[in-house]
Structures are given as structure tokens and as C-alpha cells.
Design a protein with these regions (language model features):
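Regulatory input/activation interfaces that engage signals or partners
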Residues: 1-154, 158-165
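Linker/hinge segments immediately adjacent to helix-turn-helix/homeobox DNA-binding domains
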Residues: 13-17, 35, 40-43, 136-270, ...
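Short polybasic/polar patches that bind polyanions
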Residues: 115, 290, 308
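Short alpha-helical segments used as structural interaction elements across diverse proteins
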Residues: 298-299, 312
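Residues within the DNA-recognition helix of helix-turn-helix
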Residues: 302-305
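Basic, Lys/Arg-enriched C-terminal extension of HTH/homeodomain DNA-binding domains
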Residues: 307-332
């Protein structure tokens, strides 16, 4: 998983090479499969299906690739929401359908497109932005099955990094972001701007750089869980750190602003809206904390403030409000 994450942060690769690199390294750790596929998607208009952008595959039958592309094109609005409107999740197709009271045999679109081609089930990691665009890693499975909790968590943690890397690449492509801080291992923060240079930010960024190094020092398979807990894709709900090397050989961590963007209820601060968004997806405080690179206590505090500002008494009200707003949207 660490090798996959490291290649995810390769900003020097163009789009074609980056997607191929993700597919190649995902194939090594894909459950019950010798290959993997990755693709970007746009599920913001469910009635039009799911639009696939860049994609790449490694060691997979061409029939699975073609079936996946066709499946997305023909996805129903209901399946678009089930699979692509859920944040960062990892599951098998059979498990997603089971949780929604159905099965592969009862889902005509999947049964014809994929199961009918000789792939009884498939694994998928989906990393979706609030705008319902994002990145998928998927692979066929030779039997209907569910993933164990440890494997599922490792993939979801990896998804946090791939999601952050993809979001940052898109922002850099639009020239929408610039570095705000630079940390040099052994020296600490050597540059900071836009609030990244104050004492609190300095401590957070230096700690994040040390954690990234400590995670990669735990490279063995038996230490993967510990390493993934240490290394965060987002720091303080704001920055993603990229390792770079200067021409003189100096190693640096460069921090880019990389928080997810979405429509903001005017009452909420940017930090409160992030927590409220993830809570509305049904994410637990501990998982929100991991995704945003903050503590569970900070999540609880920001969520309480957000609920108060929105006039809600419980996080379940936030989930209900989010669902009600989605159902009131035109199906466009």
C-alpha cells in the first residue's frame, strides 16, 4: 500500500503515466485478483450515467475493462448514487447491493455488463468529491464475497491519499493552487505563508513530515496498518504534503492547500463545513479525523458548532437534511 501511495504523489508524471502507475501498483495489492483498473469519473449528472475520463488497466482481461466502461455508461441514477456519492469507501459490488436490499442477480445492468462476462463480483475503491467526481480503483473477483474489516480499512486509508493526490493534480492543472509551506527534514519549517508560518501551523506541518517519514520506515507488510495510521493525506483539514528533491540533493516536504471544495452554507466556517460534509455521509468521528488529519476531539467540537449553527440537534438530523436536499434536486 505504501508504494501505491508514494506513486500517487508523483506530480512529475503526466495523466496517462500517472493513471498507469496507479493501476500497476494497485494490481500488486488488489484482493483476490492479479490485476487492477483505475479511472476518473464524473457522476454529477446521474441521469446521464457515469462519465469516465482518464483510465488505465494492468494485467486484466480486456473484456473486464470494456465491461466496466459500458457499465458506467449505462449506470442507472440509483446505482450512480449507491456507488459514486458516498465519499471514500471500499467494498465489493455484491456487498453494496446487499446493503441496499438487492443482489447482483437482481441488478440487470451489472449482471449483463460484468457478471455476464465471467466476473461474478468485483472489488472497488471509490474516492468521491462533494461534487461527485473522483477516482476509482477496481478489480474482478472470481466469486461473490465480502472484504475483511482490516483489508477494507487499509484500502480506504489508501483512498484518502489517492483522493488527495488526484484532487491536487486537478488543482495544479487548473493552476488554482500554490505551495504555502516548505519543511526540510532535520531543520523544520523553512518557509510558510497564508497562515502556514505561525507557530501552531509550524508544529502541525513539522509533525506531519516526521509522521510521513516514520510511516515509510515501516515498510514491511506486517507494519502496513501502523504505517497507514501515521501517514495522513490531509493535514489539519487543509494541506497535502509532497516530497521533492532539490537539484543539490536536499529533500523537502512541500505543503499545498488541498481541502475539498463544495457549496458552503453561509453560517459555517470552512473547517466546520468539512466536518459537517463528512458527517452527513454517515462517517464516524474517528474516520473523519483520519481523512482531515485532525483529532477526533476536534471533529466532535466542530460538528457540535456546525449542528448548532444549522439549528440541528443531532448528527442524524444532518444526514437526514442532506438526503432531503438531494432528493429535492432536479435529476439532471
Amino acid at each position: 500500500f505504501l508504494s501505491l501511495i508514494e506513486h500517487g504523489y508523483r506530480l512529475d508524471l503526466d495523466e496517462r503515466d500517472w493513471f498507469q502507475s496507479i493501476a500497476d501498483h494497485a494490481a500488486v495489492v488488489a484482493p483476490a485478483s492479479d490485476g487492477a483498473m483505475t479511472y476518473s469519473f464524473d457522476a454529477s449528472s446521474p441521469k446521464d450515467g457515469v462519465l469516465v475520463g482518464h483510465w488505465a488497466a494492468a494485467s486484466l482481461p480486456q473484456s473486464f475493462v470494456e465491461s466496466t466502461l459500458m457499465l458506467n455508461q449505462n449506470t442507472t441514477p440509483e446505482d450512480a448514487a449507491r456507488f459514486y456519492h458516498r465519499g471514500i469507501v471500499c467494498d465489493t459490488v455484491s456487498e453494496v447491493l446487499r446493503k441496499n436490499g438487492t443482489s447482483i442477480d437482481q441488478n440487470d445492468t451489472y449482471r449483463r455488463a460484468v457478471a455476464g462476462e465471467g466476473f461474478p463480483d468485483s472489488f472497488g475503491l471509490t474516492a468521491s468529491n462533494p461534487s461527485h467526481t473522483g477516482l476509482v480503483v477496481n478489480a474482478p473477483i472470481d466469486s461473490v464475497r465480502k472484504l475483511g474489516p482490516g483489508l477494507k480499512r487499509a484500502w480506504q486509508q489508501t483512498g484518502v491519499h489517492l483522493h488527495a493526490a488526484y484532487r491536487l493534480r486537478e488543482a495544479l492543472r487548473r493552476r488554482a493552487v500554490k505551495p504555502e509551506a516548505v519543511v526540510e527534514p532535520g531543520r523544520g519549517l523553512v518557509h510558510g505563508e497564508n497562515g502556514a508560518g505561525n507557530e501552531s501551523a509550524r508544529q502541525v506541518l513539522e509533525s506531519a513530515a516526521r509522521a510521513a517519514d516514520a510511516a515509510r520506515a515501516r515498510g514491511g507488510p506486517e507494519q502496513a496498518s501502523e504505517a497507514l495510521e501515521l501517514w495522513r493525506g490531509l493535514i489539519d483539514g487543509r494541506w497535502t504534503m509532497i516530497e521533492t528533491f532539490e537539484s543539490d540533493g536536499r529533500r523537502l516536504f512541500v505543503a499545498y492547500p488541498n481541502d475539498p471544495e463544495f457549496e458552503n452554507p453561509r453560517a459555517l466556517t470552512p473547517r466546520e463545513r468539512l466536518v459537517a460534509h463528512y458527517a452527513a455521509q454517515g462517517d464516524a468521528n474517528k474516520w473523519i479525523a483520519y481523512q482531515l488529519g485532525i483529532t477526533p476531539a476536534t471533529v466532535a467540537r466542530r460538528l457540535a458548532v456546525a449542528l448548532g449553527k444549522l439549528g440541528l440537534s443531532h448528527r442524524h438530523d444532518l444526514i437526514w437534511l442532506s438526503a432531503a436536499l438531494r432528493s429535492a434536486e432536479p435529476s439532471s
